[in-house]
């Protein structure tokens, strides 16, 4: 993941309020590109299904050159948030063609009896999304009931962190994610920052639906408009402090930004 030092400083400055708010919610954020570590962290979540193959180093080639992840931990050091993004080179290839070829890496594990004969269809945008494309997945934030991070706006803030870094590092033509229908119906794409949400589904050889996933996406101009707006803030946040940045060897490569929680304000 390549980023000029000046761009990296601008990014951290833009996000310092977001990091401060998350600190006040009791969330320590870690960002990295070691997907063996991500796989290890993800395996701790026994209440979730298997990691998606697109982000699993045992199934896909993914490293600091084409991906990074964001994780969140509570004051006890427990993992309460995950998300990841992967850069795809779809030059001359539509997202529709890509999903047909690599469908096994996007199908929810265990959702269909025959992944070889299951395909995604529906959204017209599948034909127009091409070029430098990012896939945003593995988004999860632990539900903590009323007064928890979700109700305080953490979903939008965590997504904003990933999108800011993604644009700063790669400036993609498009970004997309696949969201279960039950979440799309609740407007999840809006909390993630996306403004396009198209109905889609996975169909088996008999054209029977095995899973209903909405395609949420943004083009470069949508991303620019989103990032031009100030990030959503936690209303109770009062103190703003810049995030601690751990500079790896060989700048301008940025492979770890760590926010250290100073006080847990619940």
Model-derived features with residue positions:
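Short N-terminal signal/transit or membrane-insertion segments
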Residues: 1-14, 54-77, 200-208
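N-terminal capping/interface segment
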Residues: 1-44
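A conserved beta-strand-loop-helix scaffold within acyl/acetyltransferase catalytic domains
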Residues: 27-133, 137-139
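Short, flexible loop/turn elements at secondary-structure junctions
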Residues: 72-76, 87-89, 138-145, 179-181, ...
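Acyl-donor binding region in acyl/amide transferases
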Residues: 97-204
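Long, compositionally biased interface segments
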Residues: 175, 179-253
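Long, low-complexity, intrinsically disordered segments
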Residues: 249-266
């Amino acid at each position: 993941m390549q980023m000029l030092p000046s761009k990296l400083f601008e990014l951290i400055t833009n996000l310092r309020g977001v990091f401060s708010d998350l600190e006040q919610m009791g969330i320590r954020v870690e960002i990295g590109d070691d997907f063996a570590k991500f796989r290890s962290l993800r395996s701790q979540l026994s209440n979730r299904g298997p990691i998606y193959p697109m982000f699993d180093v045992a199934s896909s080639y993914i490293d600091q050159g084409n991906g990074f992840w964001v994780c969140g931990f509570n004051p006890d050091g427990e993992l309460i948030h995950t998300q990841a993004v992967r850069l795809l080179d779809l030059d001359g290839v539509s997202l529709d063609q890509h999903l047909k070829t690599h469908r096994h890496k996007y199908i929810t594990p265990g959702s269909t009896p025959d992944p070889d004969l299951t395909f995604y269809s529906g959204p017209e945008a599948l034909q127009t999304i091409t070029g430098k494309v990012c896939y945003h997945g593995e988004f999860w934030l632990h539900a903590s009931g009323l007064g928890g991070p979700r109700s305080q706006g953490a979903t939008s803030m965590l997504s904003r962190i990933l999108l800011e870094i993604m644009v700063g590092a790669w400036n993609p033509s498009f970004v997309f994610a696949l969201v279960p229908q039950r979440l799309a119906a609740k407007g999840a794409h809006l909390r993630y920052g996306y403004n396009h949400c198209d109905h889609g589904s996975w169909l088996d050889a008999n054209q029977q639906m095995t899973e209903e996933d909405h395609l949420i996406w943004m083009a470069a101009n949508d991303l620019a408009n989103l990032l031009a707006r100030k990030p959503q803030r936690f209303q109770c946040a009062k103190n703003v402090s810049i995030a601690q940045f751990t500079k790896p060897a060989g700048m301008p490569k940025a492979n770890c930004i760590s926010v250290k929680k100073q006080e847990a304000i619940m």
